[in-house]
Amino acid sequence: MFCKVNYHSVTVKALETSQLLSLHTHTLELLLSENPQLLVEYLKWLQIENMKHQSRLRDLVLNGKKGALFSTLIRLANTYGEFRSDNEVLIKFPLTNTEIANLCATSREMINRMLNDLKKHHIISFDKSYNTIHDFQFLKDEIACENCPLNICRID
């Protein structure tokens, strides 16, 4: 926007029936330049999105593969989780190990090993339609979680 870059590095997959609204770039640029309040809200949204990406990149780069998995599980819990107790979270969003590996920028085999290790230590458990984190604080402690606001520490 406001420049001539035609490359977009994101894809979207609808999880339920959705309607798509499309605006030409020029139309949005015109709306933003004519409406300062809309521009401010847009900039706030952009800043939050930037903070989400920065924190995810930080976790992937600084915490290694295990930290990437732990931070991804924390983000999944914050986005789709139902907190059952102070330390247990039910994630009602089915993901394959391949999908989790893609979120962590690592291989499925590596994720399988780490998830099985967490399962062996009763940190998490799996079911076909959901995953349960039994020791949420353990994951946070392992990556020295900074307790980012929930609108930042999310998958979406």
Feature map (PLM): residue ranges:
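A generic structural signal for short hydrophobic patches within well-formed alpha-helices
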Residues: 28-29, 139
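Structural motif
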Residues: 17-19, 130
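Cyclic nucleotide-binding regulatory domains
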Residues: 1-17
